[in-house]
């Protein structure tokens, strides 16, 4: 019962993390920068992995998609690959979790379901690591440019999508670890012992081996006949 509750908690936590990680891909605010005037904000720049946008003081946004993938910076390509891998791994991890949980009717025997649930935990951990790496790589590029005094282009700050990605990655890792611990809890189930109360077998003294060679001692028919047997 305890292992089933752990699996349910792990599934809810992992799925929540996967949803958060997936929501970062279409989110616009991976990095944000504002240009302030004397009274109001004159422009707001924001970008994600696919496009860069600018919003003027009237609230009208103009966006421009990034050029060909071969013309992109290396860190953007790496972040794209890592985030797509995180979403894909989380999808397969959720399927494995459904087959491996004890509360479901699919997956085979308890031993097979335990192995599938452990595999789901490993996949969720990998998904969280991919998301954590992608968001951290993007954030490192932003902070490096922001604190570089020689960088003269537009400087950005961390956007909301990065924090959502970090939170989702943490939940995926925590859920995967709980899945793995639930398997170790299954292996600690006590085994019931059985005692045999049947009759003990005993060899009759007539059938015991006699002699060193292990031959049975048999008594042949009597060679002495009564005289009355013959007429």
From Swiss-Prot:
Keywords from the UniProt entry: Cell junction, Cell membrane, Endoplasmic reticulum, Ion transport, Membrane, Tight junction, Transmembrane, Transmembrane helix, Transport
**Gene Ontology cellular component terms for the protein in this record:** bicellular tight junction; cytoplasm; endoplasmic reticulum; plasma membrane; tight junction
Q: Which GO terms describe its molecular function?
A: identical protein binding; paracellular tight junction channel activity; structural molecule activity
Instruction: Write out the tissue specificity statement of the associated record.
Output: Expressed in the inner ear where it is detected in organ of Corti, marginal cells of stria vascularis, Reissner's membrane and spiral limbus (at protein level).
Q: What is one Gene Ontology biological process annotated in the Swiss-Prot or TrEMBL record? A: paracellular transport
Which residue ranges are assigned to the Extracellular compartment in the record's topology?
A: 22-80, 137-160
UniProt remark on domains: The fourth transmembrane region (161-181), which is missing in isoform 3, isoform 5 and isoform 6, is necessary for integration into tight junctions.
Q: What does this protein do?
A: Forms paracellular channels: polymerizes in tight junction strands with cation- and anion-selective channels through the strands, conveying epithelial permeability in a process known as paracellular tight junction permeability.
The entry's protein name is: Claudin-10
Species of origin reads Mus musculus (Mouse)
């Amino acid at each position: 019962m305890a292992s089933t509750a752990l699996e349910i908690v792990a599934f809810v936590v992992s799925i929540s993390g996967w949803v958060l990680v997936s929501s970062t891909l279409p989110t616009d605010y991976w990095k944000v920068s504002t240009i302030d005037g004397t009274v109001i904000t004159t422009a707001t720049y924001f970008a994600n992995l696919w496009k860069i946008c600018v919003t003027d003081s009237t609230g009208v946004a103009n966006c421009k998609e990034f050029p060909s993938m071969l013309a992109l910076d290396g860190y953007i390509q790496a972040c794209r690959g890592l985030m797509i891998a995180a979403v894909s791994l989380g999808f397969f991890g959720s399927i494995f979790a459904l087959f491996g949980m004890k509360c479901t009717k699919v997956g085979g025997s308890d031993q097979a379901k335990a192995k599938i649930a452990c595999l789901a935990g490993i996949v969720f951990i990998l998904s969280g690591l991919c998301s954590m790496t992608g968001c951290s790589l993007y954030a490192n590029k932003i902070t490096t440019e922001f604190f570089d005094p020689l960088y003269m282009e537009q400087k950005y700050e961390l956007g909301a999508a990065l924090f959502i990605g970090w939170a989702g990655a943490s939940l995926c890792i925590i859920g995967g670890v709980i899945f793995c611990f639930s398997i170790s809890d299954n292996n600690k189930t006590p085994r019931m012992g059985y005692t045999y109360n049947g009759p003990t077998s005993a060899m009759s003294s007539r059938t015991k081996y006699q002699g060193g060679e292990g031959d049975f001692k048999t008594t042949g028919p009597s060679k002495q006949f009564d005289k009355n047997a013959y007429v």
